[in-house]
A protein has these predicted regions:
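N-terminal charged helix/coil linker that caps or initiates catalytic domains
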Residues: 1-24, 248-258
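Glycine-rich adenosine-cofactor-binding loop
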Residues: 21-40, 46-51
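Catalytic cysteine-centered active loop of the rhodanese-like fold, especially the PTP/DSP P-loop
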Residues: 26, 39, 300, 306-357
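Residue-level detector of alpha-helix initiation sites
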Residues: 30-33, 44, 54-55, 121-122, ...
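Glycine-rich phosphate-binding loop and adjoining beta1-alpha1-beta2 segment
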Residues: 50-86
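E1/E1-like adenylate-forming module used to activate ubiquitin-like modifiers
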Residues: 92-94, 99, 110-193, 234
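Conserved anion/nucleotide-ligand pocket segment
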Residues: 178-217
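Flexible, polar/low-complexity N-terminal or interdomain linker segments that lie immediately upstream
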Residues: 221-292
């Protein structure tokens, strides 16, 4: 039997709890891929996968569900195929879209536990608020250079619950905390933190709440293997308390993302680029694939952009694009000083809608 060895450890009743459970993983990346593999292997009955992005070659070193044949595929589609092959008993639901205030509540509604595998502060606060309102346990994980963090939110213990906002009531300023795309990441680190998260999910599903990281932030330094646990309490935080308030809350602005500087649809980008002396600047690294083919884009990687302003002075309207709108916004903020007289924008959707059209 597939689960014999773990049944020997924690019993058939707990295994049945896993088989009857439903877990949603938001983000099929460096955390999400190993998380999904582990949760499927341990016997979680139903898994949901949320991610709008496609597989790229530079993902492969840490996103173990994928290989070269998956490049260009939607991450959710590629992951479902691989997970189904690994464990045909797992029920899989793919949600190939970005999580927004419009869809977050319907997306999390049917699940017992939600796991945060994102790398975006705006989505992280949105997901935390929605799970708190819907009373969904949320297993948090984050990476920074050689360190990782794990905690469990929205589970009552000692008469109260805590959320992401109790830990981080204020979002960091732009450029304070880089994403994995910007700072880089080792697959050993993302995999270790994902294993901690998966273990917390199992604890929640079988009811081992006394040992779960509730009201506790686990900090793990992978260089010296120092583990630190920090206790935290419920705070008098300001947060949306209803679905309607989530709809009205400006998450990009709260996370210091100037919405007026963003183009959010392909149609808006089309209109922007029809202007005289307009250009699309791809700030991904040279080896990142696939290349944009909807427009002729100027390739200026973020790593060298501050030395290339002269190339852009010939244009009046400049829009930056990357994978998911993070590096492009950073490029825009850099350009505001060097190109103060230009019309500068960032394309929020990233490159995916601009290829294979």
């Amino acid at each position: 039997m597939r689960y014999t060895r773990q049944i020997q450890l924690f019993g058939a009743d707990n295994q049945q709890k896993l088989l009857e459970s439903k877990v949603l993983v938001v983000g099929v990346g460096g955390l999400g891929c190993p998380l999904l593999q582990l949760l499927s292997s341990v016997g979680v009955g139903t898994l949901g996968l949320v991610d709008f992005d496609k597989v790229e070659a530079h993902n492969l070193h840490r996103q173990f569900l994928f290989d070269e044949a998956c490049v260009g595929m939607l991450k959710t589609d590629a992951a479902v195929a691989r997970l189904q092959a690994r464990n045909p008993q797992t029920v899989l639901h793919a949600y190939p879209y970005a999580l927004t205030a419009d869809n977050v509540f319907s997306t999390i509604a049917d699940y017992d536990v939600v796991v945060d595998g994102t790398d975006n502060f705006s989505v992280r606060y949105l997901l935390s608020d929605a799970c708190a309102i819907a009373r969904k346990p949320l297993v948090y994980g984050a990476l920074y250079h050689y360190e990782g963090q794990v905690s469990v939110f929205n589970v009552e213990k000692d008469g109260y619950t805590t959320s992401y906002r109790d830990l981080f009531p204020v979002a960091p300023q732009p450029n304070e905390v880089p994403t994995c795309n910007e700072a880089g990441i080792l697959p050993t680190i993302s995999s270790m933190i994902a294993h901690f998260q998966a273990n917390e999910v199992v604890k929640l599903l079988i009811g081992d709440l006394d040992n779960a990281l509730i009201h506790t932030l686990l900090l793990f330094n992978t260089q010296n293997y120092q583990l630190t646990k920090i206790k935290y309490n419920m705070t008098d935080k300001k947060a949306p308390s209803t679905a309607e308030e989530v709809q009205q809350f400006n998450y990009p602005a709260f996370c210091h993302q100037p919405v007026g500087d963003e183009l959010t649809t392909v149609e808006a980008l089309d209109a922007f680029l029809t202007q005289e002396k307009a250009v699309l600047v791809d700030v991904r690294e040279e080896d990142e694939q696939p290349k944009i083919d909807r427009y002729t884009a100027l390739s200026l990687p973020l790593s060298v952009l501050p030395t290339q302003w002269e190339q852009l002075k010939a244009y009046d309207h400049i829009c930056f694009v990357c994978v998911a709108g993070v590096r492009s916004m950073k490029a825009l903020n850099f350009a505001k000083e060097a190109l103060a007289d230009k019309d500068l924008k960032s394309f929020k959707q990233g490159f995916s809608p601009l290829v294979n059209v």
